[in-house]
Amino acid sequence: MTNIRKTHPLMKILNDAFIDLPTPSNISSWWNFGSLLGLCLIMQILTGLFLAMHYTPDTSTAFSSVAHICRDVNYGWFIRYLHANGASMFFICLYAHIGRGLYYGSYMFQETWNIGVLLLLTVMATAFVGYVLPWGQMSFWGATVITNLLSAIPYIGTTLVEWIWGGFSVDKATLTRFFAFHFILPFIITALAAVHLLFLHETGSNNPTGIPSNMDMIPFHPYYTIKDILGALFLILTLLALTLFTPDLLGDPDNYTPANPLSTPAHIKPEWYFLFAYAILRSIPNKLGGVLALLLSILILIFIPMLQTSKQRSMMFRPFSQLLFWTLIADLLTLTWIGGQPVEHPYIIVGQLASILYFFLILVLMPTVSLIENKLLKW
């Protein structure tokens, strides 16, 4: 008799996705981050659900409701910090996952890649509206600064900003709708992740060599389930260490001051995972130009498959491209550092140079070096 997991309509879907899925035999730990992202998403939805049971999305009580969660709710402090630091772990996994895709040429699965870019944007939107909810100083001013960027859109900008605010400034209506967005978006992310997986399983996984591995596949379970569990243990260990030893390491002290529209913090900055984009935004002295650069810094990922000039898919055997890839990583780390610094000399010029290098690397240097490598292979 055939096993129920292969015949039952629901079990069959799970079986084909996680158990009998043919997987390349040589994929490395860099392929672990997809499942870790799934784990992060589940953790964020669960901790978020329990936080939502005690949180009140109202300007007069939001800040004190978060304090109440930390002080009075059983293990409320733990749930709150798991949720806050879980977001950081989510973005670490997300950036590693994208970096893997860039390095090994996974972007050649175009539908999977484009859904992935859409997922990135949705996760960023979720994290942004979530940061506003505690209604501290950085929540309020972060929301004010970032939503205000839309006013750079010609003709409809101001109307659009006031429509999003639900008034003439960030206030009660803004907080309520941001809470609604923050609640619904993770479920949209879950649906998109399912579509992402659907498209991936149409083609099968890529592997470090970038060479088709159809003749050398192994079942996902038990070989990769056990590897994924190891990765999950590392993730949980790191998250628990962060949450229990230094819960505020990645947060901003300003967010422990209740939101006050009459007092602007000295340095308005987003959470660490947005600093690279914030640095690119600030490096351009023109408002509209900055907004366009900010958008392009993320949306440039959509154009990566079109910029592929190499005859080889992966960078595994391309040392010059590898050098440029790691230069790009170093550049992004530099931008992240600059985004957290005040707007003064020498940070301004360093940020501008790093921003120029970011676009120059992706749009010009990498495609050119790939062409040179093609020529070298002919020798």
Curated annotation (Swiss-Prot):
Binds 2 heme b groups non-covalently. GO terms for cellular component: mitochondrial inner membrane; respiratory chain complex III. One of its GO terms (biological process) is mitochondrial electron transport, ubiquinol to cytochrome c. Its main location: mitochondrion. Heme b b566 binds at H97, H196. Component of the ubiquinol-cytochrome c reductase complex (complex III or cytochrome b-c1 complex) that is part of the mitochondrial respiratory chain. The b-c1 complex mediates electron transfer from ubiquinol to cytochrome c. Contributes to the generation of a proton gradient across the mitochondrial membrane that is then used for ATP synthesis. Heme 1 (or BL or b562) is low-potential and absorbs at about 562 nm, and heme 2 (or BH or b566) is high-potential and absorbs at about 566 nm. This is Cytochrome b. It comes from Lissodelphis peronii (Southern right whale dolphin).
